[in-house]
């Protein structure tokens, strides 16, 4: 194999009907009873071990699958992506003077636009 990892998986399968041959014992340490799993005893008579070879997919295929998984995850987490993106750029709370008006009759001068000066170093100034 060219740099890919392979794993040998063993499984127990029952033989087809009509076969009465003696099967070799399973490799040491791979049987269900050898691992000490609860509720599993040693192999019954007539069962045989089958080996399967697992090869990992190519690196590019794994990258594409991971990208798709991230895209799906991001779609689920962001409810309103436009509002989230816009909040970092422009916010009503930061950019407009809201509040500060006292209940009752406001003065006529407070309703007029106030002179504001913009400095790229200091932001908005009055």
From Swiss-Prot:
GO terms for cellular component: ciliary basal body; ciliary base; cytoplasm. Residues 13-45 are annotated as: Disordered. It is found in: Cytoplasm, Cytoskeleton, Cilium basal body. Transmembrane segments: none annotated. It comes from the Eukaryota. Keywords: Cell projection, Cytoplasm, Cytoskeleton. Its main location: cytoplasm. The keyword Cytoplasm applies. InterPro entries: C11orf97-like. This is Uncharacterized protein C11orf97. It comes from Homo sapiens (Human). The gene is C11orf97.
């Amino acid at each position: 194999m060219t740099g890919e990892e392979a794993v040998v998986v063993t499984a127990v399968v029952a033989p087809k009907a009509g076969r009465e041959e003696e099967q070799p014992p399973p490799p040491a340490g791979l049987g269900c009873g050898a691992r000490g799993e609860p509720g599993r005893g040693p192999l019954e008579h007539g069962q045989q071990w089958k080996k399967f070879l697992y090869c990992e997919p190519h690196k590019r295929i794994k990258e594409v699958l991971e990208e798709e998984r991230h895209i799906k995850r991001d779609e689920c987490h962001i409810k309103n992506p436009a509002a989230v993106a816009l909040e970092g750029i422009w916010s009503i709370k930061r950019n407009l003077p809201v509040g500060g008006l006292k209940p009752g009759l406001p003065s006529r001068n407070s309703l007029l636009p106030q002179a504001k000066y913009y400095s790229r170093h200091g932001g908005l100034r009055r």
